[in-house]
Amino acid sequence: EIDLKVFTEAMEAMFEGKEVKMTEAQAQEVMMKFLQEQQEKATAKRAEDAKVNLEKGEAFLKENATKEGVKTSASGLQYKITKEGEGKKPTKDDMVTVEYEGRLIDGTVFDSSKANGGPVSFPVSQVIPGWTEGIQLLKEGGEATFYIPAKLAYREVGAGDKIGPNATLVFDVKLVKVGAPDAAAQQPVQVDVQKVQ
């Protein structure tokens, strides 16, 4: 265990040119141990967060599956069509333009096309699997809510500081257009819906 007080005093003495109670090599060794301990703590916390998020997500999806209008695909994607579209239906090879809002299961909004300046365009096959599958269920003008389990989203990796490991995601989506984007559409799509490699 590192005595932070002794370490801090030694570092201050070194910077002030005073006599140091430890050599530079000893200070580096202590610093390396400290950094390693911090990394181990962060890794353990991330593993615990992943476990908790997965459990909460599974419970959310189990309850959500019983709600009126919610359907579950073979992959585990849950969706609710809130407005039937009348236009073209996309394939995985198409480019689409959408409006969306992404939330965590606690309701925290982590991304939205409105906040990013308007509709966003992207290739259907270049986003997370839950989006690739879900967007193909809609026709132009259609709207839906996608309830995406972690295995169809960012899995144990998470995305940035907003989407934790094994997070279940909820997206309200409107399919604006299938095909080449309009000039007003933002490109490329934000990281929160990009495909995880």
Which residue ranges define each predicted feature?
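Cross-family detector of peptidyl-prolyl cis-trans isomerase
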Residues: E1-Q197
